[in-house]
Amino acid sequence: MADLAKIVEDLSALTVLEAAELSKLLEEKWGVSAAAPVAVAAAGGAAPAAAAEEKTEFDVVLADGGANKINVIKEVRALTGLGLKEAKDLVEGAPKAVKEGASKDEAEKIKAQLEAAGAKVELK
């Protein structure tokens, strides 16, 4: 047990660069790859219908600023806290995300506010 405590102590003392080098050495020694978890994540996407039902985070995407861009810019500023130039760039550069990782209720509220201002909005 003392050996394990010593190993933990030694690993804790490593710098980030040393830890990265250790990781590479262990991959070579054991013949494994750190990329393996990516394959597991890709396999998890095999059931998109189930994932769509359980989706809890949404991205509010401004698809088009519409004809009344001034009102849309004002609404984007109010919702995001962006400055005038940043909000204008976001509206004119549509399609762009206004809010990422929003809850369903928050995303629908933001969508309704932007649509009331004249924008076309998508939830992703």
Swiss-Prot record:
CDD domains: Ribosomal_L7_L12. GO terms for biological process: translation. The keyword Cytoplasm does not apply. Keywords: Ribonucleoprotein, Ribosomal protein. The keyword Ribonucleoprotein applies. Coiled coil: none annotated. One of its GO terms (molecular function) is mRNA binding. GO terms for cellular component: cytosolic large ribosomal subunit. InterPro entries: Ribosomal_bL12 (IPR000206), Ribosomal_bL12_C (IPR013823), Ribosomal_bL12_C/ClpS-like (IPR014719), Ribosomal_bL12_oligo (IPR008932), Ribosomal_bL12_oligo_N_sf (IPR036235). Homodimer. Part of the ribosomal stalk of the 50S ribosomal subunit. Forms a multimeric L10(L12)X complex, where L10 forms an elongated spine to which 2 to 4 L12 dimers bind in a sequential fashion. Binds GTP-bound translation factors. Forms part of the ribosomal stalk which helps the ribosome interact with GTP-bound translation factors. Is thus essential for accurate translation. PANTHER family: 39S RIBOSOMAL PROTEIN L12, LARGE RIBOSOMAL SUBUNIT PROTEIN BL12M. Belongs to the bacterial ribosomal protein bL12 family. This is Large ribosomal subunit protein bL12. The gene is rplL.
